[in-house]
Amino acid sequence: MRPPRGGGSFRGRGGRDNGGRGRGRGRGRGRFGGGNYDEGPPSEVVEVATFLHACEGDAVFKLSNVKIPHFNAPIYLQNKTQIGRVDEIFGPINESLFSIKMREGIVATSYSQGDKFFISPEKLLPLSRFLPQPKGQSGGRGEGRVPPRGRGPPRGRGNFRGRGAPRGASRGFQPRGGPRGGFRGRGRA
């Protein structure tokens, strides 16, 4: 087994490898190149947009759903035949447009204005995700809440003294106004 990237050893918290918490395992294996993997047709599709026009090989659509499609989400005909993937989303938020990168062998000019296109409901996001949240409403991380704590031990556990804190734990908290200063090092047992 190789040591974690950037960590240099198996001891401690893993250095720059995000704490050695398993994120680095299996990198590159089992993934499909660039998200272009054909997932097959979904069990259900809903109308998402109508065709406006072709532009430089891509197709431009007007959103007809109240939700916004994911970037790179597959777009289908009503019979669940995939024609391409969402490339760009643009325009005013209440009249959004998006372009589709067509699949190989499918020509954007073969469709006419008003043709309907479909998407898996799992690939849609609510419009509220793209709107500013009013102050005080629970939104993103840390807004209006107690700030998240780091990796250290729970409060009230005191101070770890001596050499070599337990694996994955910090050196503890110093009381307010207590000694501040240099780095003591990790220590080797």
Swiss-Prot record:
A GO cellular component annotation in the UniProt record: chloroplast thylakoid membrane
InterPro entries referenced in this protein's UniProt entry, alphabetically: Gar1/Naf1_Cbf5-bd_sf, H/ACA_rnp_Gar1/Naf1, Transl_B-barrel_sf
UniProt keyword Ribonucleoprotein present: yes
Disordered: region residues: 1-39, 129-189
A GO biological-process term: pseudouridine synthesis
Lipid biosynthesis among keywords: no
GO molecular function, one term: RNA binding
UniProt feature, compositional bias: Low complexity: 162-177
Keyword terms of this UniProt record: Nucleus, Repeat, Ribonucleoprotein, Ribosome biogenesis, RNA-binding, rRNA processing
Highest taxon, organism lineage: Eukaryota
Annotated compartments: Nucleus, Nucleolus
Main location, first listed in the record: nucleus
Entry-linked SUPFAM superfamilies: Translation proteins
Biased composition (Gly residues): 1-12
Biological role stated in the UniProt entry: Required for ribosome biogenesis. Part of a complex which catalyzes pseudouridylation of rRNA. This involves the isomerization of uridine such that the ribose is subsequently attached to C5, instead of the normal N1. Pseudouridine ('psi') residues may serve to stabilize the conformation of rRNAs.
Assembly and interaction partners: Component of the small nucleolar ribonucleoprotein particle containing H/ACA-type snoRNAs (H/ACA snoRNPs).
Family designation: Belongs to the GAR1 family.
Protein name: H/ACA ribonucleoprotein complex subunit 1-like protein 2
Organism, as annotated: Arabidopsis thaliana
